[in-house]
Amino acid sequence: MRQYLDLCQRIVNEGCWIENKRTGKRCLTVINADLTYDVANNRFPIITTRKSYWKAAIAEFLGYIRGYDNAADFRKLGAKTWDANANENQVWLNNPHRKGTDDMGRVYGVQGRAWRKPNGETVDQLRKIVNNLSRGIDDRGEILTFLNPGEFDLGCLRPCMYNHTFSLLGDTLYLTSYQRSCDVPLGLNFNQIQVFTFLALMAQITGKKAGQAYHKIVNAHIYEDQLELMRDVQLKREPFPSPKLEINPDIKTLEDLETWVTMDDFNVVGYQCHEPIKYPFSV
């Protein structure tokens, strides 16, 4: 929690104003942020200086694991995070590749589970990683990437957190996640939860011990219409201790994650937080 607040304070103190053409807003921006999450000791990195809707964050990433490409499927899991980008992004609404209401196109999990090869076949990146790690194999290329520049025009949004690299040291599994762009007041807590939970789940289904998760952000920013709430409200609050994440131990395979797992299989224990803060969201 403290490293999150330190990053927020750094942006407020040192950030540079940059105009964002996609949203038409200015962003207070810093370059390069490194965060570390202690998955081994289950120090769940959830925001406590405002209420965090952690179930939606996990639901969204579960949708990526399943390769979903439709906002309606994410809503069924408990995440409304794709409603706006699928249905209110004017560039995407005008895109001839859009298939209709709630269609997201070839983004995130679609790339992770069905990356297109030149011959028309697809690559299931996640399946390969799970298979290798389950056998104790780390080929130094256990990489899940959502970034496919050749298909940017086939999706409603380029991936922000775009790369997840797994590493094995003995029987301990580590994760390094890379993010090109981060809306810190709104998006970062989702991303923190997702990085932490992804490592915890992958360790569980491959029979490994979870180590540390490393989260590397290139462009970390606060939008101009978020700044006052961050500076004058959230940063004035004292954080509470980190809670713990409980995951149903019956989740043992990738197939489990693909089929029957719901948000009822996750629980956060000991979560204390301040009142919610409604930050503006930029499409």
Curated annotation (Swiss-Prot):
DUMP binds at residues 22, 180-183, 191, 221-223. It is an enzyme of class 2 (transferase). One of its GO terms (molecular function) is thymidylate synthase activity. Its EC number is 2.1.1.45. InterPro entries: Thymidate_synth/dCMP_Mease (IPR045097), Thymidate_synth/dCMP_Mease_dom (IPR023451), Thymidate_synth/dCMP_Mease_sf (IPR036926), Thymidylate_synthase (IPR000398). Its main location: cytoplasm. Pfam families: Thymidylat_synt. (6R)-5,10-methylene-5,6,7,8-tetrahydrofolate binds at residues 183, 282. Pathway: Pyrimidine metabolism; dTTP biosynthesis. The active site is at residue 160. It comes from the Bacteria. GO terms for cellular component: cytosol. It is found in: Cytoplasm. Keywords: Cytoplasm, Methyltransferase, Nucleotide biosynthesis, Transferase. It catalyses: dUMP + (6R)-5,10-methylene-5,6,7,8-tetrahydrofolate = 7,8-dihydrofolate + dTMP. GO terms for biological process: dTMP biosynthetic process; dTTP biosynthetic process; methylation. NCBIfam families: PRK01827.1-4, thym_sym. Belongs to the thymidylate synthase family. Bacterial-type ThyA subfamily. Catalyzes the reductive methylation of 2'-deoxyuridine-5'-monophosphate (dUMP) to 2'-deoxythymidine-5'-monophosphate (dTMP) while utilizing 5,10-methylenetetrahydrofolate (mTHF) as the methyl donor and reductant in the reaction, yielding dihydrofolate (DHF) as a by-product. This enzymatic reaction provides an intracellular de novo source of dTMP, an essential precursor for DNA biosynthesis. Homodimer. This is Thymidylate synthase.
